[in-house]
Every structure is written in C-alpha cells, then in structure tokens.
C-alpha cells in the first residue's frame, strides 16, 4: 500500500478538540456545529444559517444524551457483536440520525436530520466524532470502497445500510482495512481508498 499525503485546509482537520466540551456540556454550540460541518462537507455550511440557536442546542442535546445513555458498547471492534447487539446498534443509530422529511413516518424529520445543513454523511460524522469506537463516518467515498463501484448511486443513506457498512468495517473483506486497529481508522481508510489517496 502506498500512501500519498495531500495537504488539507485547516477547516478540513477533524475537530477532535471539541469533543470533551460537547460531551461535558451536553450539546453542540452553533459555532461547534459550523466547525464540524466545515470539516465534513463545506456544502452544508450555508444551510446551517437556517437553524435557530435553540434548535441546534436542543437537537444536539438529544443526540449527546442518547450517546451517553448509549448501548453499553464502548468499542464495536472489541465486542463480540451478536445479532441482538447489532439490532440495538441499528435502532440507536436510527434514533440519533433520524429520518428526512420524505422518509419520516409522519412526514416530520427526526433526529439530527432535523437540522438544515446536516445530511446523512454529516450526521454520521457527528456520531463518529463524539463516539468513534461505536459509530463510523459514512459518506459516498467510503460507500464506493465498501460496497463497490457505483454503490453511491443507489440509496445508501438508511440505518440498515449504515449498519451493514459498519459490520463490513468491523469484519472487513479488504485486506488493508483488516490491518487497521480502530473503527475510525478503517472508515478514514475506506474514504481514502476511493478518493485515490491510498493505493490498493
């Protein structure tokens, strides 16, 4: 495997320094959300201005509380994940991420997807930033690596697909991913493989 390093803009650096404050305070501030969305997808930044400060604090407080109450899982790579645990994992991911208006049961968006500027990839990035041992970041680049070329053209932004993606990171078929010891490291590598940063 050859690793080519590309210089990232400062806003593209994963804002790990925010995690302790967020988890301690129990919510994400508007400024922190801006930094997180800028890291994951600059496309959503302008949309963030459509959220009120109260919405950002309230919706992210639900997420942080949900992560703290959790599943009793501290690391999916270090846990013998039974079908029952995966069902619980999927339900929790679905609850925290939520559903967009067009897919919500009553037409009302839920979870993090209630926030303007937060789509499925950004929602998984929020979970992955705050709980990287349990929730990976899932985006179109990683989808292409894990499910094959063209996979991002199909509907992949669902809790069942997120579960399947996570299971394939926990038990990867790609040799390069098997060598990586952290879930976050594996999802980063999956993105980089598709983007051509890692050559396999």
Predicted segments — roles?
Residues 105-147:
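Catalytic DNA-binding helix-loop module of base-excision-repair DNA glycosylases/AP lyases
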Residues 1-36, 135-200:
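C-terminal accessory module of base-excision DNA glycosylases/AP lyases that mediates lesion recognition
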Residues 21-22, 36-39, 66, 70, ...:
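Residues that form generic nucleotide/phosphate-binding pockets
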Residues 45-118:
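Helix-hairpin-helix/helix-loop-helix acidic hairpins
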């Amino acid at each position: 495997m050859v690793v080519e390093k590309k210089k990232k803009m400062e806003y593209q650096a994963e804002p790990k320094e925010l995690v302790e404050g967020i988890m301690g305070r129990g919510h994400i501030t508007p400024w922190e959300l801006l930094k997180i969305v800028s890291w994951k997808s600059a496309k959503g930044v302008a949309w963030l201005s459509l959220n009120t400060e109260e919405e950002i604090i309230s919706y992210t407080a639900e997420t942080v509380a949900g992560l703290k109450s959790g599943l009793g899982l501290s690391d999916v790579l270090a846990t013998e994940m039974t079908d029952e645990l995966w069902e619980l994992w999927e339900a929790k991911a679905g609850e925290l991420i939520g559903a967009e208006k067009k897919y919500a049961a009553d037409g009302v968006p839920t979870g993090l997807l209630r926030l303007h500027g937060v789509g499925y990839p950004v929602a998984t990035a929020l979970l992955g930033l705050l709980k990287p041992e349990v929730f990976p970041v899932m985006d179109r680049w990683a989808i292409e690596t894990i499910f094959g070329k063209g996979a991002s053209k199909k509907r992949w932004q669902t809790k069942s697909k997120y579960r399947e993606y996570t299971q394939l990171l926990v038990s990867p078929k790609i040799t390069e991913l098997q060598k990586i010891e952290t879930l976050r490291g594996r999802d980063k590598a999956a993105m980089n493989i598709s983007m051509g940063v890692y050559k396999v």
